[in-house]
Amino acid sequence: MFDPFGDFATEGYLRNFDKEKDLEIVKIAEHELFRAQLPAALDFLAKRKQIEYADFLEVHRILFEGLYPWAGKDRAEVLPNSAVKKGALYFCHPRDCRLAVSEGWSVAHDKKLLDKRPGFIMGMFAYGHPFLDGNGRTMLLVHAELCFRTNMSVNWMRTSKQPYLDALTKEIQAPNDGHLDAYLKPFIAPQIPRDNWLQSVSDLPGLDGIDAESDVSAGYSDPAITKEYQEFERRRGYQLDNKRAH
């Protein structure tokens, strides 16, 4: 059980307002909240002249503030000294959440690149992993809006959950190799109206992203964790550009 706060026994899964410990119930609540708040989140994105990191956080808040007290707050604010990993895969250090997402913006805001590198963008969002839960839904909505503004879309209904998640995992591990770009290429399609997106998005495969409940949290104060994280970053072989944070 993912318990980064260390208080699951008294506060439930990720300190949800009901202190619910049954993960199946929590996930149902997440999904129903997402469906209910989806129009508001998409409307918010549609009105933004240029989407930035603060808007990424706001989408998460809109979707999940009815369930989690930390909704809309990233790991740098909530748990700045804790690593989040899944097996041998590490998400970025909390201090780099903004940098990682902004690295995705650097491609997303270039209309000549977005249709060629949609997987790179999604991979950077996933590596940034700003939130303790709800990353998959949040980044999917932001990614869809970015695609819309470039007169394109990803036909997510034609994708399959496990192959997508496998490609996403490889993308996080090796962002220079184009794993997710290659996976998504056959699914690139013309722009679709936002209303059509609204009707279908709640049932997309892989909506949760890489399942948060299987995450593990550990303090960077543990030398073994720090060493393992540094080794993962070395193998990953990608340097974030701190000039791009916005």
What are these language model-derived features?
Residues 1-133, 137-246:
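FIC/Doc superfamily catalytic core
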